[in-house]
Each structure stands twice: as structure tokens, then as C-alpha cells.
């Protein structure tokens, strides 16, 4: 069976489908039809079946103040109870979390132990004055205490905001200030590529100015490197938590009470604090674990994502634990101490469901394509990819070499803002197409449309929108309702009503499958990490030679995308093309400090100007076309100075061809 691009469709094996939760496309379409015919009834049934409510909800969906939607009003619950306490009768001695550190250390937390450690951490947080509604920033490595503190916050009703440990002190400071955090939880450091790296000094620098809301800092001792302690502010978690009681009653939370904030890059420079509510988020985390990974009680499940990103929230911590699965957490990189580490872990821990990024797949494929053959990977039943579209050649290697042609690949599309998967194959039902997200999940009304809501025809590029609300959707941007509407509900309408625009472009193929074409806004995706171009350009502007810049993405065989900077030099600058390499190094030094090592420019081109509209907006789509060496098809007649495009094209050809 071939699609319009002559790519083979890979059908699920009959054996797998026979035992899957959703066994075929007929069952998939039955669920879709149920959601279409009785939208609220569909979600009501799911919510009552999946969640252990303290008190039942009285209203499924409140659209009175759309797009500020509310779900399951009147209901009360606690997310940590959903993930831990409810499993005590049947799974108390089952492994909940297995941790492997980079230095070879290993630890197993049963559901009973994880509950006890969560309660002890929750009691410690309360002793430090943290109460319902307070914000706790977590700046931690991939160690069990990170998940424990997240669950402890959920238990007492505090709102956690995890900040990726690779972010700079300045980026951390911005997030602490915006959230108004009362407490910061960090570690002395951790290990990466066999060496200790530090986190506490970054916290010290972040708190050195403008973080008046922070009262205390809790430090988990991980790598035992020397750190500075500030008396009256800094306390060692490990010493204090062991004295706490292992009993802590869960706070009764309303369905719409916030569970966490997670900051994501925006096109205006300032990161956006995405808000997620308790009931809708945990419901969809659990449902997608069951549907997309076909999670079963016997599964050892591994998602390789860092908890600093939404994937780590939903598919390392909350989703697996809500389902009563065993989740694997690892510290380190895919290629240390060698390129066989991940395959050795799959063999050793008998992983059955494995979820990772296309960047990691491409890296391992390039580094040691035959290494997986040294290991027994036969326990794998489902493979998954996340963070960016996967190119067909990487997909095929993953399918052939890692899955042995028997494990379906769920190529998942979703976002920080969606809370969980939105468009993805179902492993027992959907014929797979390499590099294609395929079909929306039941209950998710994802469509490729134009600005007026007209559905695009096969092969036509359009806007990827979600035309109905869903339980795990973003509830707003922390402290900025106007930006929430502008960012997500101002680009497209359907039937006269504003709908959620993802920021991605997409098209339908002849099978009705959706293929994601990438960002349409000023956000780049490097190795699965979204970074706002405005944030990068603001940092670059601190270089004395830079008058103006525009940053776009170019294709990268390992990262998927990397950064290309068009730089206009200041009149006083003495820099020329001969100094480009040195300037590139200097710019990357600035970016490392301002944002972190994930923001690294790979190529730089000096230009006399940038293509702008008459209103002054930089046309990054044109620059992206030039940077990628593609033919310009955009209309440049409306530009303030169309000749600048011709100049940039000539400079790019001279520099890079």
C-alpha cells in the first residue's frame, strides 16, 4: 500500500492489534464518532472512568468566558493521590520509578516508597511555609527527587514550575521573577559525560538581584561538589527530609486549580508561563498513556526526556504513575560512556515501551548505526518519537534496527500548551507513514484550515488548529490574559469563533493523514527545544558590533534544525567577513550566558540590511528560504526595500556555496 509520495504504509502486526486497547481503525472511528455526536458525554464518561474523584463534578465544560475554558467544575481531586495513593491496594510493592545515574548508581522506588517520600517532601515544604497556590521553582537534574518534589507540590496544592537545568542564571531569574516563586528547589549539581556539573551556582547568580519573592532555597546533594551556602536562606534537603513524617493528607483541589506552570518560548522575547489545571491535565495524561503507548500493568516504560520540558512532566512523571506503570528515569546523555548505553538499558530493564526524540535517534544512528545489534531489544513493543518531525530515513532505522520491524512507531505531535498528545498513530490501529503524525486522537478536533476556517484540500499548506477545546489545554499565560488570546486565539476562526492555532503549518495527504511542516511563527525548534527568535536576537544585540539581527532555522542532520544568524553591523564596527568566525564565537558565548547552551548559532552572514515590511516587521520566512538555499517564492514586492533580498542572496551564495 503506497501513499501519494510513494512511501510505504506500515500496518500494525495482527498479533499486536489483537491485544491492543484500540485494535483497529473501526474502533478508533467509533470513539471519534462518539466525541462528535456527544462531545460532553464523551468527556464525562472518560473523566468518571479514569479519575478517582473526592467529589464528582457537576458541569463538564464551561465555555461562558471562552477561550478561558473550564472543565469538570464542581469536582475535587488530588493529582498526587491519583498517581500514588489509589495504587496502594493493588500495586504498593510494584516498582513505580527506576532510576539509573550516569555514574552507574541505581535505585528502585516502589509505589509505597514513592508515596512515603512524596509525603515527607510535602511535609518539609509545608514546614518552609509553602501552602496552596504558592509557586515553587524546581531547577534540578534528572534524579528521583525531582519527581518527588513535583508530586509533593501537587499533594499540598503548591504550583510547581520546573526550569530546565541547562538554562542560564539569567533565564532562570526571568522565570523566578515572573512566577513570583516563594521557594527554589535545586541540587548542588549532577553528572554529565562522566564529570560533575553544577546547578547551585546558577541559582546563586539568579537570586543575586530582583528575586525578592524567594524566601528559601532547598538543596538536594547529588554530586557532593563544594558549594556556597547563604545562612538563613539555603538548607540541605537530604538532611531535613529524613526527619519528616511519611504521612501527609492530600489537599482537596478543585478541578481547575493550577497544577503547574511551565515556561515556553514566545515570539516576543519574554517566555510565557503556560498554566495547566489539575483534572483535565491528569485525565489526558492517563488517557494518552493508555491509548498511544497501549500501556499495560506489566510494562517497563521509558521516556528519555528531561523533566524540565513538558514531555518529562506528562510522560516521565504524571502519565506513567497515573496508570500504575513502571517509569524509568535516567541521568546523562545517549552516548556516554558509549553509544550502547541506551540499548544496554533497554535489555537490562526489559523496556517494552520506549519514547525519545528524533535528535537522539539521528545522533545514535550517525554515531554507531550497528551498535543496537549487540543487544537483545526483543522486549520492545512500542516505540515513540517526540519534539519535532522525524525524517523518514531516521524513522526507518528506528523501525528496523531498534524495533526489529515489529514495534510500531507512534510519531507524536503535541505541545507544551496541549498538555499531551494530539495527533499520533495508535499502535494497534493506525497504518504508519514514516515522518507523518497521521490522525488526531478521539476527542481532539485538529484540522488544517485557512484563517477563515475553511478546510484545506489534499496537499495544500494550511494552519494547524484545534477547533474545539480539550481538557488538558493551556488555561492561560501566567499574569497575561491578553497575551494568551493574542498568542493562541487571534490567527484563525471557524464558524465565526476563534480557535486555537498551534503556530505550526501542516497539510493533508490522500489518506487524510496530517503532516507537520514546521513553525509558521518566529520560534525555532532546535533538537526538540523551542526557542523564541526574539529572545536570541535580544541577546545577540548585546554584542557591540551588532546593530540588528534576524535568526532563522536551517536543516541539521542531527538536531533537525540549527540556528542561522543574519547580522547587520553597527556603523562603528570594525568587524568584517574575515572576523566572522571570531564574532560567531563571541555571539555564542553571549547566548550561553543569556539563554543556555541549547541556543548556539551554527552559521552567520553579515548583511547591509534585513528584508522588512513597510510596518517594520522582519520577514523571517524569506530569510529562512535564503538560509536553506531554497528558491524564493514569497512575494517580495511589498517589502520596504526589495533590493536587499537580492543582495543577501548574492552574499549567501558567495559565502556558503
Curated annotation (Swiss-Prot):
Cell inner membrane found in the keyword field: no
EC number: 6.2.1.1
Binding site for ATP: 387-389, 411-416, 504, 519, 530
Binding site for Mg(2+): 543, 546
CDD domains reported in the protein's UniProt record: ACS
Cofactor(s) recorded in Swiss-Prot or TrEMBL: Mg(2+)
Organism: Campylobacter jejuni subsp. jejuni serotype O:2 (strain ATCC 700819 / NCTC 11168)
Catalytic activity of the protein: acetate + ATP + CoA = acetyl-CoA + AMP + diphosphate
Family statement: Belongs to the ATP-dependent AMP-binding enzyme family.
Keyword Magnesium attributed: yes
One Gene Ontology MF term: ATP binding
Described purpose of this protein according to its UniProt entry: Catalyzes the conversion of acetate into acetyl-CoA (AcCoA), an essential intermediate at the junction of anabolic and catabolic pathways. AcsA undergoes a two-step reaction. In the first half reaction, AcsA combines acetate with ATP to form acetyl-adenylate (AcAMP) intermediate. In the second half reaction, it can then transfer the acetyl group from AcAMP to the sulfhydryl group of CoA, forming the product AcCoA.
Enzyme kind, highest EC tier: ligase
Entry protein name: Acetyl-coenzyme A synthetase
GO biological process, one term: acetyl-CoA biosynthetic process from acetate
Keywords from the UniProt entry: Acetylation, ATP-binding, Ligase, Magnesium, Metal-binding, Nucleotide-binding
Positions where N6-acetyllysine occurs in the chain: 617
InterPro entries referenced in this protein's UniProt entry, alphabetically: Ac_CoA_lig, ACAS_N, AMP-bd_C, AMP-bd_C_sf, AMP-binding_CS, AMP-dep_synth/lig_dom, ANL_N_sf
GO cellular component entries: cytosol
Cross-referenced SUPFAM superfamilies: Acetyl-CoA synthetase-like
Residues annotated to bind CoA: 192-195, 311, 592
Post-translation changes: Acetylated. Deacetylation by the SIR2-homolog deacetylase activates the enzyme.
Amino acid at each position: 500500500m503506497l501513499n501519494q509520495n510513494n512511501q510505504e504504509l506500515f500496518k500494525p502486526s495482527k498479533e499486536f492489534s489483537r491485544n491492543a486497547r484500540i485494535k483497529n481503525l473501526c474502533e478508533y472511528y467509533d470513539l471519534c464518532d462518539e466525541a462528535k455526536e456527544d462531545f460532553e458525554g464523551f468527556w464525562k464518561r472518560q473523566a468518571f472512568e479514569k479519575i478517582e474523584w473526592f467529589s464528582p463534578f457537576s458541569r463538564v465544560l464551561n465555555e461562558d468566558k471562552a477561550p478561558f475554558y473550564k472543565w469538570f467544575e464542581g469536582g475535587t481531586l488530588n493529582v498526587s493521590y491519583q498517581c500514588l495513593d489509589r495504587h496502594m491496594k493493588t500495586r504498593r510493592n510494584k516498582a513505580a520509578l527506576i532510576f539509573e545515574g550516569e555514574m552507574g548508581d541505581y535505585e528502585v522506588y516502589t509505589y509505597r516508597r514513592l508515596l512515603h517520600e512524596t509525603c515527607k517532601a510535602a511535609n518539609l515544604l509545608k514546614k518552609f511555609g509553602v501552602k496552596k497556590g504558592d509557586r515553587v521553582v524546581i531547577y534540578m537534574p534528572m534524579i528521583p527527587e525531582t519527581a518527588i518534589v513535583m508530586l509533593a507540590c501537587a499533594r499540598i496544592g503548591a504550583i510547581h514550575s520546573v526550569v530546565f537545568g541547562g538554562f542560564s542564571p539569567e533565564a532562570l531569574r526571568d522565570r523566578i521573577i515572573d512566577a513570583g516563586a516563594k521557594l527554589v528547589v535545586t541540587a548542588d549539581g549532577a553528572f554529565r559525560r562522566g564529570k560533575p556539573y553544577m546547578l547551585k551556582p546558577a541559582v546563586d547568580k539568579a537570586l543575586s538581584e530582583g528575586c525578592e519573592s524567594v524566601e528559601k532555597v532547598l538543596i538536594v546533594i547529588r554530586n557532593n561538589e563544594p558549594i556556597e551556602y547563604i545562612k538563613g536562606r539555603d538548607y540541605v534537603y537530604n538532611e531535613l527530609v529524613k526527619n519528616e513524617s511519611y504521612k501527609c493528607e492530600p489537599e482537596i483541589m478543585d478541578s481547575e486549580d493550577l497544577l503547574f506552570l511551565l515556561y515556553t518560548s514566545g515570539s516576543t522575547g519574554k517566555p510565557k508561563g503556560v498554566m495547566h489545571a489539575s483534572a483535565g491535565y491528569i485525565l489526558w495524561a492517563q488517557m494518552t498513556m493508555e491509548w498511544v503507548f497501549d500501556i499495560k500493568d506489566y510494562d517497563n516504560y521509558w521516556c528519555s526526556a528531561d523533566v524540565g520540558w513538558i514531555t518529562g512532566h506528562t510522560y516521565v512523571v504524571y502519565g506513567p504513575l497515573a496508570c500504575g506503570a513502571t517509569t524509568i528515569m535516567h541521568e546523562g546523555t545517549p552516548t556516554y560512556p558509549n553509544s550502547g548505553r541506551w540499548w544496554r538499558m533497554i535489555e537490562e530493564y526489559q523496556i517494552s515501551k520506549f519514547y525519545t526524540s528524533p535528535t537522539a535517534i539521528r545522533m545514535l544512528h550517525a554515531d554507531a548505526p550497528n551498535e543496537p545489534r549487540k543487544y537483545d531489544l526483543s522486549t520492545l513493543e512500542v516505540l515513540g518519537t517526540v519534539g519535532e518531525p522525524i525524517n523518514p530515513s531516521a524513522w526507518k532505522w528506528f523501525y528496523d534496527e531498534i524495533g526489529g520491524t515489529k514495534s510500531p512507531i507512534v510519531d507524536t505531535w503535541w505541545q507544551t500548551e496541549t498538555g499531551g498528545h494530539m495527533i499520533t498513530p495508535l499502535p494497534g490501529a493506525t497504518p504508519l507513514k514514516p515522518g507523518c503524525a497521521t490522525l488526531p486522537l478521539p476527542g481532539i478536533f485538529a484540522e488544517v484550515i485557512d484563517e477563515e476556517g475553511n478546510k484545506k484540500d489534499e496537499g495544500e499548506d494550511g494552519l494547524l488548529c484545534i477547533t474545539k477545546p480539550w481538557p488538558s489545554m493551556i488555561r492561560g499565560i501566567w499574569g497575561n490574559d491578553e497575551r494568551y488570546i493574542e498568542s493562541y486565539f487571534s490567527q484563525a476562526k471557524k464558524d465565526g469563533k476563534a480557535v486555537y492555532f498551534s503556530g505550526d503549518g501542516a497539510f493533508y495527504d490522500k489518506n487524510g493523514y496530517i503532516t507537520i511542516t514546521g513553525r509558521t511563527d518566529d520560534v525555532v525548534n532546535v533538537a526538540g527545544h523551542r526557542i523564541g527568535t526574539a529572545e536570541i536576537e535580544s541577546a545577540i544585540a548585546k554584542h557591540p558590533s551588532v546593530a540588528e539581527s534576524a535568526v532563522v532555522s536551517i536543516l541539521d542532520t542531527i538536531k533537525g534544525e540549527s540556528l542561522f544568524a543574519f547580522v547587520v553591523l553597527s556603523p562603528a564596527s570594525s568587524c568584517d567577513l574575515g572576523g566572522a568566525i571570531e564574532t560567531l564565537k563571541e555571539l555564542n558565548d553571549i547566548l550561553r550566558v543569556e539563554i543556555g547552551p541549547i541556543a548556539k548559532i551554527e552559521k552567520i552572514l553579515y548583511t547591509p540590511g534585513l528584508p522588512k515590511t513597510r510596518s517594520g516587521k522582519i520577514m523571517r520566512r524569506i530569510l529562512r528560504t535564503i538560509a536553506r538555499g531554497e528558491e524564493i517564492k514569497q512575494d517580495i514586492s511589498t517589502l520596504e526595500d526589495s533590493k536587499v533580498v537580492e543582495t543577501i542572496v548574492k552574499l549567501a551564495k558567495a559565502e556558503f556555496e
